[in-house]
Curated annotation (Swiss-Prot):
Gene Ontology annotations of biological process type: isopentenyl diphosphate biosynthetic process, methylerythritol 4-phosphate pathway involved in terpenoid biosynthetic process
Classification of source organism: Bacteria, Bacillati, Bacillota, Bacilli, Bacillales
Family annotation (PANTHER family): 1-DEOXY-D-XYLULOSE 5-PHOSPHATE REDUCTOISOMERASE, 1-DEOXY-D-XYLULOSE 5-PHOSPHATE REDUCTOISOMERASE, CHLOROPLASTIC
Organism: Bacillus licheniformis (strain ATCC 14580 / DSM 13 / JCM 2505 / CCUG 7422 / NBRC 12200 / NCIMB 9375 / NCTC 10341 / NRRL NRS-1264 / Gibson 46)
Protein name: 1-deoxy-D-xylulose 5-phosphate reductoisomerase
Pathway note: Isoprenoid biosynthesis; isopentenyl diphosphate biosynthesis via DXP pathway; isopentenyl diphosphate from 1-deoxy-D-xylulose 5-phosphate: step 1/6
Enzymatic reactions: 2-C-methyl-D-erythritol 4-phosphate + NADP(+) = 1-deoxy-D-xylulose 5-phosphate + NADPH + H(+)
Keyword Metal-binding: yes
Record-linked SUPFAM superfamilies: 1-deoxy-D-xylulose-5-phosphate reductoisomerase, C-terminal domain, Glyceraldehyde-3-phosphate dehydrogenase-like, C-terminal domain, NAD(P)-binding Rossmann-fold domains
Molecular function GO terms recorded: 1-deoxy-D-xylulose-5-phosphate reductoisomerase activity; manganese ion binding; NADPH binding
Cofactor: Mg(2+); Mn(2+)
Residue sites binding Mn(2+) per the record: 148, 150, 219
Length: 383
């Protein structure tokens, strides 16, 4: 039995992780969980899975949760401290980081210090502090298992392979909600249109990131850290069906791809069960006859400027990816609240990157300060 700590239980990845735990309740137990503001959903999860510890986003949500009557007692915590308390709970074997944003960094590092296996769905952890996370993983000798479908695909393709034989990684991308539109057609698109992803069921922020292709850019930076490869050995390929989740090309020109129907529960389960493979009858089997054909196209930097920003930031390194991520988070929030246009997201990110003075090898404190400063700068652009 593996005991799971789930950070971000009420989000999209969190819910799908709970599906996996429920499907294999003889293999997995939810020991600790955190959530942000959705007290109603959290109350259902608590009563169903009965975790020993529950972290709540803020005081107001905590007061709302207290109004529910539960059939058992459990420990609680509030705010960022609760994220860390949950991540280091002695009973947990695996910490699933399903948080959105850079708030996921510190709990990951603390969990590593307590020898927890990390199942990472929080992109920002590696994007903002990849060098620190990798150092921690090596220092404390803890596995860092990818949950993203693309990185899981690469991870699976590399099982039993010598990393020295890799020629390149090919990260596939659906292209998001607006993959068939020109830049001119993107002017004036609505939030509702942007949130209508053709293939995947995801949260609002990641769905917008998918539409701008920033999501793929962040995944490229993640892949750089996860698989220790330079950026010129990581390619992005548009593949609208989302059937091939990613590929690895080796020096002998062989290519290994991982395929499957788009269902995030499959890579989540692989991260939880690794090195085992468990059955998962909830997922639909891949029927290539039914799919009929697979389509591919080049990822154009001029069309997808956020992808270009990510490659450039990754190559520069240091604190540049931190600024990229912080500016993107603030810009996406502004778009979702109707304060800027869809293309305005790119403009804000570009301005934040242009003004930044890079720190080559930042400490954790410097990363936090740069993150805060970048967000403040974006807010000045929005007022």
């Amino acid at each position: 039995m593996k005991n799971i700590c789930l950070l971000g239980a009420t989000g999209s990845i969190g819910e799908q992780t709970l599906d996996v735990i429920k499907a294999h309740d003889d293999k997995f137990r939810l020991t600790a969980m955190t959530f942000g503001k959705n007290a109603e959903k959290a109350a259902e999860i608590i009563e169903t899975f009965k975790p020993k510890y529950v972290g709540v986003g803020d005081e107001h949500t905590y007061e709302t949760l207290k109004q529910h009557s539960f059939s058992y007692t459990f420990k609680t915590g509030i705010g960022e401290e609760a994220l860390i308390e949950a991540a280091v709970i002695p009973e947990a074997d695996i910490v699933v980081n399903a948080l959105v944003g850079s708030v996921g960094l510190l709990p990951t590092l603390k969990a590593m210090e307590h020898k927890k296996t990390i199942a990472l769905a929080n992109k920002e952890t590696l994007v903002t502090a990849g060098h620190i996370v990798k150092e921690h993983a090596q220092k404390y000798d803890v596995p860092l298992l990818p949950v993203d479908s693309e990185h899981s695909a690469i991870f699976q393709a590399l099982q039993g392979e010598n990393p020295k034989h890799i020629k390149r990684l090919i990260v596939t991308a659906s292209g998001g909600s607006f993959r068939d539109r020109t830049r001119r057609e993107l002017e004036g698109v609505t939030v509702e249109e942007a949130l209508n992803h053709p293939n995947w069921s995801m949260g609002a922020k990641i769905t917008i990131d998918s539409a701008t292709m920033m999501n793929k850019g962040l995944e490229v930076i993640e892949a750089h850290w996860l698989f220790d490869l330079p950026y010129d050995q990581i390619d992005v390929l548009l593949h609208k069906e989302s059937i091939i989740h990613s590929m690895v090309e080796f020096h002998d020109r062989s290519v290994i791809a991982q395929l499957g129907t788009p269902d995030m529960r499959v890579p989540i389960q692989y991260a939880l069960s690794h090195p085992e493979r468990l059955p998962f009858n909830e997922a639909k089997s891949l029927d290539l006859w039914e799919v009929g054909q697979l389509n591919f196209a080049q990822a154009d930097f001029e069309r997808f400027r956020c992808l270009q920003f990510a490659y450039e930031s990754g190559k520069i390194g240091g604190t540049m990816p931190t600024v990229l991520n912080a500016a993107n988070e603030e810009a996406v929030a502004a778009f979702l609240s109707g304060r800027i246009s869809f293309l305005g997201i790119e403009d804000i990110i570009e301005k934040a990157l242009e003004r930044h003075q890079v720190i080559a090898k930042p400490s954790l404190q410097e990363i936090r300060e740069v993150d805060k400063d970048a967000r403040k700068f974006v807010q000045t652009l929005l007022t």
